[in-house]
Every structure is written in C-alpha cells, then in structure tokens.
Amino acid sequence: MMITKKLYQCMCLLCMVIALLDVVSSDDAKEQKMKDKIISLPGQPPNLNFSQFSGYVTVDPAAGRALFYWLTEAPRPSGTKPLVLWLNGGPGCSSIAYGASEEVGPFRVNPDGKTLRLNLYAWNKVANVLFLDSPAGVGFSYTNTSSDELTVGDKRTGEDAYRFLVRWLERFPEYKERAFYIAGESYAGHYIPELAQLIVNRNKGAKNPTINLKGILMGNPLVDDYNDNKGMRDYWWNHGLISDESYNDLTKWCLNDSILFPKLNCNAALNQALSEFGDIDPYNINSPACTTHASSNEWMQAWRYRGNDECVVGYTRKYMNDPNVHKSFHARLNGSTPWTPCSRVIRKNWKDSPKSMLPIIKNLLQAHLRIWIFSGDSDAVLPLSGTRHSINAMKLKSSKRWYPWYHSHGLVGGWSQVYEDGLLTYTTVRAAGHEVPLSQPRLALFLFTHFLANHSLPSSPS
C-alpha cells in the first residue's frame, strides 16, 4: 500500500513537472514570437494593414542548422485565412529573394535598392504566406557545420523543412490545425511533393493533425527527368529555337540523363543548343534578354543552374545586403559574406535527387490531397510540354478535358485540364515565364484564389 501511495505521489509530481515545462515552453515560444515581429522594414510604405514576422527556427541543434522564415499575414483579421508555405527551388535558391521579393510577397524593391512599394497582387491578400529559405546555407538560413553545404540533398532538405514546420507551429500555435498548403516553383517540384509525403505519412492515425495539409500548388516544376528533358527538347524545336541537328543530339544524349548533372555528351548537346537561342531570355522567351552576365559562357552556366532567373533580383540583392535590413529581419549574416539569391556551393554539391516525383504525386492523390500544377507558356527552362508529358505518364482519369480559361477581364488566361474527379488540375498561363507571378501577377493571384477555394478556372468569360 505504501509503495502504491509513493508511486502515486511520484506520478503526480511528474505530471506537475511536465505541465510546468509545457507552460515554460509555451511562454518561451510566445516570447520568441514577439521578438520575431517586424516593426518596420527599411523603406517600407506606411500604414500597413497586415503583420509580419521573421526569424530563425533551429532544425538541428547539434549541427547548428537554423532555417530563416518570413511570415506575411493576411490583412487583419487574418484568423480565418489558410496558411501557405512558399518554397523556391534551385536547388539552392532563396524564397526570400524570389518568391517574397519578386513574385507573391507584399512588396517590390524599387530601383534605388533602398525603398519598397506594395505589390498589388500579393498572395497575402487571401492567405497567410510563410516564406522559407531552405536548405540551411541558402539566403539568410545558416549552419554552423560547414560540411552541411557539401552533403545536402533532397532527403535532408525535406526532413529539415518538416522539423521547421513542427517547431514553428509551437511558436505560432494559432496556425495549428489551420488549413495548410504548400506552394512554389521550379526545383520545388521536388521539395513540395517530398515534404507533403512526409506530412501525410506522419499524420496517419491523427484525428486532428497539427499540420492540416489540404493541397499543393506547383509552378513550372521539375518533376520527372525523362519527361522534362523530352518536353524541353520538344519546346525548343517547336518554337524554332534550335536546329534539327541539336534536336537529334538532345534526343540521343539527354532524354535519359539527369537534369541537375548531365553527363559529358548531354552537356555538349545542351551547350550547342543554347548557343542557337541567340540573345533571348530562356526564362521568358518573349521578354528582353538578360544582360546581367558578362559573357555568353557565364549566361549559359547561369541558365543551366536551372534555379531562378538572377536577372530579376538586382534591386533585391542591393536591398538585402543593407545591414539595416538584416537588423529589421532579425537576420544573422557573416559580415564578410554578402547575401546572395542562390548558393552555387549547395547547387554544385547537391547529393540525392530522385529522377521522378511521379510516384509520390500518385501517392498524394491516393491520399486525397488536392494538387494544382501550372506552367507559364513562355518558359523554356522547364516548359509546359515537359509537365504535360509527365501528367500523361501517370495515366490519370480525365474529369474535364482541355479547355480555355478566362480571367476577370473576360480574356483567355490560359488552358486547363482536370483529372481524378478534381483532385489534380493542370493549367497554363498565357504570356508568362518561369516565374508566373512575376510576369503575370494578376493572373497568378486569380489562379491562386481559385486553387484555395477549390474552384475550377472559369471556362467562359464572366
């Protein structure tokens, strides 16, 4: 009896300690959240009607890996709006540099590199948007273990992003169980399905999962090496960008090769094909050519980087290297190392990169996750033809055949097809490049709003 009583007392004491630790942990999270609140960014417009937070979440204490985030909440009250995580690709490119500063974020950097203007088509008008620099070593994210940047790949990036979400939600508990989506572009065609798969697997058996994943949205994504190589070749030849000889060489050497690390013969075929493009921007073949790179060789290497167009981030680069901006963002940066939009070290040393995301995408559909994929039809980097080949390879059931969709001005915004009783939607965006929200911001917001509402894009003018 005495032993039972003592055991009971010990159990009660243990419960009290655990409860106390939970309270302390909760208080620490609240305190850190308030420290993360952005009072004002340098040069930001006055009288904003939304809140911003930014800072770090440690994902591996032993290695000292910490990921940087920037949360731009929806206009107040934001409590009913979903949470959307935005990821850029590369691999090795910053979501703060591209997604936040050039595409779907609330601000654009002015030509002076010092002041900001409002983005009229910011996605935080309809959702709370969370931008993440991933993996560690990209943008403002960092690691205290230098070898991390030489050994990272898809697997660790996904695991770290999952840990980030779990720990970030402790800091922002109001977003627990909130409708959650993952969006992004380019190599995020790997990041997004892989992270979604982790969430789905770890949510199994949970009645009210903390990460309430509802769907994913991918723009001009890399999802399958074979089909993307095939689609790239087709797009280049069909648009008159390359010769018959280059078409044949790409067919011979590149179809079964790696997108990230092509072998010698494929590399030679790609370089020859690129030399035939002339003075155009492959990220948007109908836009003025990029003049950032000093030589054609540098231009081709930058394009082959297959991350994001560095030509569009000149103003952002200047802004993000301002120490006052770092202070306002609560960002840590080595004073001797300038902020860069992409990490060439990470890109060059990327380790694991599965050849195809199609099996994962099919698994996500079987888990009844909603998937939208969109393509800017002027992108020659990861063109629409590759994505269409990939979707066809999955042999999905068509629910609504190919049709033109119309935006709010009654004009054709692109073309779309719906599969698997509405679970997967594919759509193109007219006159848009690799970064659709950059070249067609109005259409991108229109598409995003329909995605969140689970409404098909309109098939007739309104």
UniProtKB/Swiss-Prot annotation:
Residues annotated as glycosylated: 49, 144, 256, 334, 454
Signal peptide: 1-26
Cystine residue pairs: 93-342, 254-266, 290-311
Tissues in which the UniProt entry reports expression: Expressed in seedlings, roots and senescent leaves.
Subcellular location(s) of the protein: Secreted
Keywords of the record: Carboxypeptidase, Disulfide bond, Glycoprotein, Hydrolase, Protease, Secreted, Signal
Residue numbers annotated as active site: 186, 379, 434
Enzyme class at the top of the EC tree: hydrolase
SUPFAM superfamilies, per the entry: alpha/beta-Hydrolases
Highest taxon listed in the record's lineage: Eukaryota
Membership in a protein family: Belongs to the peptidase S10 family.
Protein name: Serine carboxypeptidase-like 28
Organism: Arabidopsis thaliana (Mouse-ear cress)
Taxonomic classification: Eukaryota, Viridiplantae, Streptophyta, Embryophyta, Tracheophyta
